[in-house]
Amino acid sequence: MKIENYIRDIQGFPKEGILFKDITPLLNNVEARQECLSILVNSLKGQKIDKVVGAESRGFFFGMLLAQELKAGFIPVRKPKKLPFDIISASYELEYGTDSLEMHIDAIKKGDRVLIHDDVLATGGTAKAVCELVEKLGGEIVQCNFLMELTFLNGRKKIKEYPVFAALTY
C-alpha cells in the first residue's frame, strides 16, 4: 500500500500560492493509517521510548498512536494559554514574526528517552522549539519523526543535531 495515495493536494490553502498536503484521507482509511504507523514505528529500530511529544495540532493524531504502540506516555505541546498547569515555553520564527509553544513543566523527567512527532517538517521552526522544550526538562531526543517532509524548505538544517525520519518526502 502506498500511503502517499492518501495525501490530498489542496491548491491555495490556507492562502494563495500554497500547496497544502491534506492528511485527512489517510486518517480516514484504517489500512493506510496502520501502514503509516508501522513505517513510523519501524524507523525507530526497536529503540526504547519513554515519552512521545506531539506538536499541536496535527502531531497529536499519530503522536497518540505512536505512544500507544510504543507503550510510552504522550505529551501534547500546545500554543500559548492552552495548558492548565505550570508550563515552560519556547519561541520560534514564523514568516512574519514569532510564535511560541508550551509544555507542562512536569511532562518529562531528566533522562526520559523522547520521540518528537509532528505531521510535517517544513521550515523546522516548530520542531526546533519542541526540541528546546524537551531538552530544557532534561529529556534525551531519540528521533524527530514526521509523516511528511517538504524538502525544498530545508527544515532539517534547524534540527540537524537530531536523528530525523519522515515517512514521505516532497
Curated annotation (Swiss-Prot):
Gene Ontology BP annotations: adenine salvage; AMP salvage; purine ribonucleoside salvage
GO MF annotation, one: AMP binding
Catalytic activity field: AMP + diphosphate = 5-phospho-alpha-D-ribose 1-diphosphate + adenine
Root EC class: transferase
Membrane-spanning segments: none
Subcellular location: Cytoplasm
EC number(s) stated in the UniProt entry for this protein: 2.4.2.7
Subcellular location, principal: cytoplasm
Pathway involvement of the protein, from the record: Purine metabolism; AMP biosynthesis via salvage pathway; AMP from adenine: step 1/1
InterPro entries: Ade_phspho_trans (IPR005764), PRibTrfase_dom (IPR000836), PRTase-like (IPR029057), UPRTase/APRTase (IPR050054)
GO annotation, cellular component aspect: cytoplasm
Coiled coil: none
NCBIfam families: apt (TIGR01090), PRK02304.1-3 (NF002634), PRK02304.1-5 (NF002636)
Annotated function: Catalyzes a salvage reaction resulting in the formation of AMP, that is energically less costly than de novo synthesis.
Protein name: Adenine phosphoribosyltransferase
Originating organism: Flavobacterium johnsoniae (strain ATCC 17061 / DSM 2064 / JCM 8514 / BCRC 14874 / CCUG 350202 / NBRC 14942 / NCIMB 11054 / UW101) (Cytophaga johnsonae)
